[in-house]
Structures are given as C-alpha cells and as structure tokens.
Amino acid sequence: MSKRADYLSKYLNNELSDKPKKKKHKKKSSTTPATSMNIVVETPKPLGVPSIDNNEEYNELNQQTKDNEVDVDEFAPVKLKTTQKSNKGFKRIDNGDIITTNNTTTTTPPPSSLSSSSSVIKPNKLQPNQETIYRDSSGRIINDIKQRQEDLQQQKLHEEQLKQFTEIKTSKQDQINQEQEIFKVKNGHVDNQFEDPMTSFIKDTTTTTKKEFEDVSKSKFVYNKGINIPNRFNIPAGYFWDGIDRSNGFEQMYLRKQTEYNYDKIDSKINETYEIDIGDD
C-alpha cells in the first residue's frame, strides 16, 4: 500500500505549491544619453491668394512663355516634312546609256576615255522600238510574214492529206485482216438473216477474245516427251508424267461430243431444207 500512497501523493497533490518558482530575469533598459538639439520654429506665413501684380517671379515666367508661344490651332491637321527623292533615271543594259526623266540619254564613255580631261557627256536621241522577230519551230528567224503564212497553209494541207491517205498492207495476214474489217457486217442484224448460210461463219463481235500468252516460269515443269492428252480445261500434264493414260476416258468422250454438236449445228445451217406447200391445180 505504501507504493500506492506514494504514487497518489505524487500526482494528486497541488503541483504549483510543491514546485519551486522560477525567477524571471527582467531586461535591463538601455539608457541613451540625452543630446541637446537647438530647434528653431518660425512663424507661418499668412494664408491668402498671391497678387499677380506684386509677384515678380510669376510675371517674369509669364512673359517668357508669351514670347516663345506661337498662335497654333490645336485642331488643325498635322503637317509632316518629307524629303522628296530626285529621280535620276535608269541605265540601259544594251548600250549602257542613262535615261533621265527629261527623255534625254547620257552616254557613258569607255573606261579609257574616263582618264582623259574631256569628260563631257553629250545627250543622244532615243532609239526607236525594235521590231518583233518571228522564228519557226527550229529556231530560224523568219523575216517575211507572208512566207510564214504560206508555210502554215502547206502544213494544214499536209495534215488533211494524211487523214485521207489509206495505208496498203503488204503481208498476207495483214491483207486478210483488212478484208475482214472492210466486209464486216455493219448493221448488226445477223440473227434476222437466218436464211443466209454464211452467218454461221461470221464471228460475233460482241464476244471478247482472250489473249493467250505463255507463262515461261510454269512451262518449265510441263511434260515434253510426248503428246499431252487434251482435256476441257486445257491443263497440260506435269513434267514427271510417264505418258500412261490411267483415266476412264470421260474427258475424251466429252470433247468428242462437243465437236459433234458444233459440227451438226453448222451442217444444219448450211444444208437446211424448207418444206414448200404448192397447191394442186
């Protein structure tokens, strides 16, 4: 219990009475030595409006400003002084003459004559305007305008003759193609001419012809030791084919039927017969 009593007596008693009071140190006031000063106070001047007549300074300043001032209107436009540049003319490139505003030319002497004492420049008259120079397509100068017009007319005639000129083909194949173009049916009514047997041989112009070309990169791997068996897709045999036909013969039968059908179609148009009913008398 003694420990508990000591604990309570320590924290429950009045702390202010038990603790010793700290002494506060007062700051010492720094005393400055008093210095004696002689201050003179003047009596103020009486207030009032100064008279213009008796004020000499004001009269002198007013007189100076009146002498310096000039009667100027505040609302008048401001005038600026500009320096006008004198036009000295320009220099010609071809002969070096200097042309002034008075249409007078001053010739510049050569450098050899500049060193001489006589450096007087005499004005010369203006040269007349040069005539226009006409040139052809090759760059040659054309002096006569009539000759130029004749050349243009001849050129136009030559172009018209070229349009009317018909080219004659020399090779046999070119002549055949030219004849086909000349005798081509122009009206386009081939279907109506069913009695004409030659219509079966006329090619339809509306169908587009495919251009056949050989693929060099793929033709290297094609069978080339014998005859390729034809098929409806025109696919050649491979390079490693041994030449033995192992198919069931469907492709050959299909192609044979196609050729027979086309042949019968042409034959029926050529040898077509008509039954004519003739009345008995």
Curated annotation (Swiss-Prot):
Residues 1-68, 93-123 are annotated as: Disordered. Residues 20-29 have a biased composition (Basic residues). One of its GO terms (cellular component) is cytoplasm. Residues 142-181 form a coiled coil. It is found in: Cytoplasm; Nucleus. Signal peptide: none annotated. GO terms for biological process: mRNA processing; RNA splicing. Residues 100-119 have a biased composition (Low complexity). InterPro entries: Bud13 (IPR018609), CWC26_splicing_factor (IPR051112). Keywords: Coiled coil, Cytoplasm, mRNA processing, mRNA splicing, Nucleus, Spliceosome. PANTHER family: BUD13 HOMOLOG (PTHR31809:SF0). Associated with the spliceosome. Involved in pre-mRNA splicing. Belongs to the CWC26 family. This is Pre-mRNA-splicing factor CWC26.
